[in-house]
């Protein structure tokens, strides 16, 4: 779905030659792309939940809490300082929430598999999720400040995130 999101974004920008509306069809695909990934990771995590020790669960909860606090400390002041329509506010807020859910699943899974043979791909996946959190926060910050442009630093961070996700899935495939 993220391929469809990127394709629709490119269609607006390169084919139609217009500023990409926000929210747009691309946002439907970006947001929709999280759902199968989160469902799959949730099912994967659920399968191995019995291997989670209380100590590791506590550590994972602390890390997720810190990540959530940092993300919200940057997002909420910027979002509430703007005079947004309800649709824009919901769209702006859903990205960090979904990013944090993805990161949380990665951290919880890493807490289960840490020290094991398949921990490497979870580290990479967590890095990709972290890059997504950073890129989305930076995007929202730039849009709020009126400094966003296509091809900026946030877009490079997204591309790096895609690359790290691909590397994670490649590493996981090589483990079997």
Label for each model-derived stretch:
Residues 1-176:
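Polytopic alpha-helical membrane-helix bundles and their juxtamembrane interface segments
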């Amino acid at each position: 779905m993220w391929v469809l999101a990127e394709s629709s974004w490119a269609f607006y920008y390169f084919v139609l030659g217009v500023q990409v509306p926000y929210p747009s069809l691309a946002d439907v695909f970006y947001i929709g792309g999280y759902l199968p990934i989160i469902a799959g990771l949730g099912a994967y995590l659920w399968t191995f939940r019995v291997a989670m020790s209380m100590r590791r669960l506590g550590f994972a909860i602390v890390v997720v809490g810190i990540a959530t606090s940092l993300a919200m400390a940057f997002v909420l002041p910027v979002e509430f300082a703007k005079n947004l329509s309800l649709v824009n506010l919901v769209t702006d807020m859903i990205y960090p929430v979904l990013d944090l859910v993805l990161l949380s699943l990665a951290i919880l899974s890493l807490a289960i598999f840490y020290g094991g043979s398949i921990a490497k791909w979870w580290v990479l996946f967590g890095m990709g999720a972290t890059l997504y959190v950073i890129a989305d926060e930076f995007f929202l910050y730039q849009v709020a400040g009126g400094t966003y442009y296509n091809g900026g630093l946030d877009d490079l961070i997204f591309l790096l995130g895609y690359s790290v996700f691909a590397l994670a899935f490649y590493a996981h495939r090589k483990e079997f």
